[in-house]
Amino acid sequence: LDWEFNTGEYLKSSVVVSGGTAFVGSETGIVFAISIENGKEVWRYKTSLGIDAPPLVHNGVLYVGSTDGFLYALNQEKGELIWKYETNGEIMGAANQAVRPKSNDSVLVVGSYDNFVHCISAKTGKMVWTFETQNYVNGVPTIYDDKFVVFGGCDSVLYVVGLEDGKLIRSVEVEAPIAASVSVSEGIGYVGNMDRAVMAFDLESGEIAWNYRQKNFPYFSSPAVTSTHVLIGGRDKGLHCINRISGKQDWRFSARGRIDSSPVVAHEKVIFGSMDGKLYILTLKDGKEVASYEVGEPISSTPAVLDGRILVSCEDGNIYSFISEPGK
């Protein structure tokens, strides 16, 4: 352990790192900026309600959604408000940034509990388009091929819409609500649902490539995809490694608590937190435990992994920075 920073707040938001600073939001609506070097606070900014979503940093601006329904744009260095955009529902997932293919303007795409996905100008904070679903949108919309937005929501449908204009291109029934984000690689979308299934979809045809089912439990974790594997945490306390081609299980690791944390793959290792209060590091090849760090309180957030360092926020309000050897 290199350092820990106590926010004094309940934390569900994941830590995001940019330019030597770590950013995280708290359940009372405070955005903290913390120096990675020494774990000291750089600035803080207060929104009016809680923050569950991880921030997004792009071009010196921090974008963060709040349960007050606003997406805030803050100056990354000083934490000063640039603009805020109002949706009519809680924002529970991070925004994503993209450049529209024809208009060539930088936009943010974010889901809300008002049942809409909103596309917003990064510069002005004004609406570009909205797309209506039939229920809450929880996860981060995924940008695919620089022209499509892929997301699922609580209406049990996976959507592909045009980034330029927000028009529906394809929709696929996925049998149960989706709480997390869709991971896209080489034209295939991978997602876990609330009814024990992890699915792979061909985004061109909308056909299901495979459907991985275990016993009855939901997935709140977003999958990590490598060239050969799909990795996802489950409420069965398992980290599932699925063969990307066949959809069959390659291995499964058992933790002592459920895994809502989305795994991160780095240096042939898989890193994730569990509600058992541990941060785990496994080998990607066979799921053997390399190391684990006991923090003692539930971890539902996704770790931030950068050069020899792992940062993770914990529900007890602490942010922990662990030094790991490069390549380990």
Where are these predicted regions, by residue range?
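A short beta-strand motif characteristic of beta-propeller blades
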Residues: 1-5, 40-45, 80-85, 126-131, ...
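C-terminal structured "cap/appendage" subdomains that terminate the fold
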Residues: 271, 279-284, 288-291
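Intrinsic disorder/low-complexity signal
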Residues: 1, 104, 145, 164, ...
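Short loop/turn segments that connect beta-strands within beta-propeller blades
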Residues: 35-39, 75-78, 121-124, 162-166, ...
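Repeat-blade elements of multi-bladed beta-propeller folds
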Residues: 8-32, 45-72, 85, 89-118, ...
